C-alpha cells in the first residue's frame, strides 16, 4: 500500500498548476497550491500516508458530514421532516430551488441543507461550535484539532448568500434559531483545521458499521451508517457526484479547501488533499489520485 500511494502521488503531481485555489473565501486564497497528500486508514487500525498528509487544511464542506452525524445521533429520524436526501442537480448555494420547494432543502450536503442541520444542532447543544470541535477531536483521536478563526471570520464577512438561504427558510417556517448565531456555528464547523490523517481516522466509523474502533464508540447504527454513506454517494461532491461515482465508485465528501474523503465500506477510509480545484469545486489532483487508487485496488462499490 505504501509504495502504491507514493506511485500515485508521483503520477498525479503534474496536474498541480492546472486547477485554481478557492479565492471566494479570501483566507483560503492564500494557501500554497503545490501541496498534495493522502492517507488511507484500515479497519484493522493500520495507517498509510504519503506526501503532505500531515499538513492541516480547512475542511470546509467535509464538516457537513460531522454535522449530519451529530444531528442523527441526537435527533434521529425526525431530522428528515425538515430536509430530504435527494441529489439537487443545482449549484450548492442555489436559492431558486429552495424557494420553488418552499424552504425544504434537497439534502444535507448543499448549503441550505447544512444550515438546517446546524439549526437542529443549535437547538440541541448549548455551545454548538465547541460541541462540534470536541466531537471531531474524539472521532479523529487528535485533541489538537482547532478552528481557524481567520477563515471563520472571512466566511462570516462574506455570508450574504448563506444568510439569504437561512432567512428564506425561516420565512417558510423551516428555521427556528437566530440566523446570525447559526451562521457563526456553521462557519466555525467549516473552518476546522485537520490533515489527511485526522480525516481518514475521523471517518473510519463509516467504513465499520458505525463503530469507531480507536474511541470504542458506536457512533451510528449500521442502518444509519448505510444512510449517511448513500447520501455521500449521491450528493457528496457538489455537481460532480455522478462523475465521482463513475470515476471512483465510492461514497465521498469534498470541500473547497481541497480535501476529499472517501469510504470503502467494511475496509478503509481515504483522505486526499490538494488545494487546487476543478471547475466543479473539487480537488483536481485529489480526484485523479482517488480514481487511480480505486481502480488499482478494485474498490468501487459498483
Curated annotation (Swiss-Prot):
Domain of life: Bacteria
Amino acids binding substrate: 61, 111, 155, 162, 186, 238, 256
A molecular function GO annotation: glutaminase activity
Disulfide links within the chain: none
SUPFAM superfamilies, A to Z: beta-lactamase/transpeptidase-like
Keyword Hydrolase found: yes
The reaction(s) this protein catalyses: L-glutamine + H2O = L-glutamate + NH4(+)
Name of the top EC class for this enzyme: hydrolase
Gene Ontology terms describing biological process: glutamate biosynthetic process; glutamine catabolic process
EC number: 3.5.1.2
Keyword annotations: Hydrolase
Subunit structure: Homotetramer.
The family this protein is said to belong to: Belongs to the glutaminase family.
PANTHER family in the record: GLUTAMINASE
Protein name as annotated: Glutaminase
